[in-house]
């Protein structure tokens, strides 16, 4: 149970004002009903920039998390994605990441239209089932040109010399209000 004062502090997170508010959530929280509900309430209470780090976590167009994040992104004034992974592994992974940014960026009405433009599919038969798999990719120069209009890529060698990674575990004590919010999203 929380006190009236603690409840008021929690509710103050959702007061509409012009000050910058930052909410950091693990992308996994968007797979839960509580996480989606909390993020939705926050996004609808503030002028926000919603950024997805490691945006390849939203590459699957049928995943619940991907659908939730794309839907919530519509409530954010600004959207950004970031990833350290090269996009050359599977160009089809770009569709939902771009859809999160703006559903009109790639000018396709569906994932399947996008897939038909940039991949040749073949049918494989497996244990009495037929499945569609990518045979080869196509029109990648065109896709690359399209991406240049709204993306920015920095290679590791283009950056300053980076020191070796230094891993430090930090234990953070949450306030009662923070712990309550954290527990609600579990």
What is each PLM-predicted segment?
Residues 6-7, 32-33, 60, 88-93, ...:
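Switch/connector loops and helix/strand junctions flanking conserved nucleotide-binding motifs
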Residues 37-38, 43-48, 57-72:
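Substrate-gripping "pore-loop 1 plus following alpha2 helix"
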